[in-house]
Structures are given as C-alpha cells and as structure tokens.
Amino acid sequence: IPRKMSNVNSYLAAKTDDFAKILEHEQEILYMMAGQVSQNKMQEETKKKTASKKTAKTILDAMGLKIVPAKKTEIMRIKKLLGQDASRFYAAWKVINKRTQRNFDDFLKEEGDIETKLLWHGSRNENWISIMQLGLVLCPVTQITGKMFGEGIYFAPKAHKSLGYTSLEGSYWVGGKSNRAFMALFEVAYGTHYHTDTSYGIGRNFGYNDLQRRLKGAHCLHAHAGSVLRNDEIIFYKENQVS
C-alpha cells in the first residue's frame, strides 16, 4: 500500500518467512481503511439528511449498529470467562450489528436446534471499527499467511489466547505496545464440530467444503491443545455462523 514510511527497511522482508507477516499486516490495513471509508460515507449521508431537514440519524444508526453498556449480570459473566485475565477488565459494551445478527439468526433457524457458544476473538485496536461495522469476514489473505487450519474465522475458548492478538503491550502474537486493548465475545453456531489435535493434512486453503469431507454436516473445526497447539482454537468457515 503506497504511503509515507519513516523507515522503509522495517517494511522489507529479510527472510522468506517475513513475506506472510508483511502481507497479513498490509491486508489488515486495507480492512481498516475499508471500514473507515464506509464510515465516512455514512457520516456524509447523515449530514445531508440533517441539512435537508429529514429525520436525523446517528452515526451508529447509519452503520447499522446498536451499542449499549453491558449489564451487571453480563459483566459478571464476562469476568468469569476472562479467567486468569479478569483483573485486566475495564469496561464492556454490548454491540449488535443488525446485518450480521440477522444473518446469524437466519442460519440458526435453518439449522434448527444447535448449540451456540460464546468465544473470544482478539484483534489490534485499529481493526475494531471495521470489525463492528463489517463483521468478521473470511479473509483471502489466509491463503498466503497459511493459518494452521485454513481459510476460517478463528476463535478461542480461553481469553488469554485471544489476548495475544490484541494491541496490549507485550501481546504474544502481534507485539502490542498499548496500555489498552479490546477483545470481543462472539456468539457462534458451534453445533456439530470436527475434532482434531493436529494440522496434518489440513492445508492453508482448507475451507468449508474440505470440512464437510472430513465430517459431513460439521459446523466448525475444534482444534485441541496438544502436539501443535498450546490452547484450543475453534474455526468457522462461514460468516453467517458468527454473530
């Protein structure tokens, strides 16, 4: 992505293994920019409607979002699910993306009575506006970065695992430098799940059709801690299985 760089060398690959990291970082920037562009368009539309004396909408209305402070009972549950990181809790909000929630609800109706779970997802601070507005999307960059279990949306049952992907100072996977970070609990359609404790035979292009060949009717892949993972990961290959 063309832009001003303070030190070009820091953006260059020193070894082959750096290619995937650089491409993933550039993709995250594009994802963030897409959300910002969409938000700016909505702000302009809101201003025009207000100026023409039509019913004024808030930015959140234009983005299709409803955000309210979490209730006391919800906060208690969040802290419980944070486990060893409960002391890091600062504040919580309930975010409803009307479009993704509608798609999720429709999926549950089609599938019938299937189990849902609340699972953690961590990301850098700058990504959250896009995530709230666009939802979690299946990103083509996974074909390049070679995520261990293919082209999916990744979650963790343990908060500490997801914390490593946030901007928090010292975060394990992204080397965060911030004293504040954000994580989210997503309701997901866990349903029928394919269990594995190895990535053997699961290529970087592994997707929903591949999952069905492993276990017909499976909604997700549950990778258990063991020989290749320190913590469980649960991967979904359809966007409408995530709220």
Description of each model-found segment:
Residues I1-N127, G226-S243:
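Intrinsically disordered, low-complexity terminal and linker regions
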Residues K47, S52, D105-S243:
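Segments that shape or occlude catalytic/ligand-binding pockets
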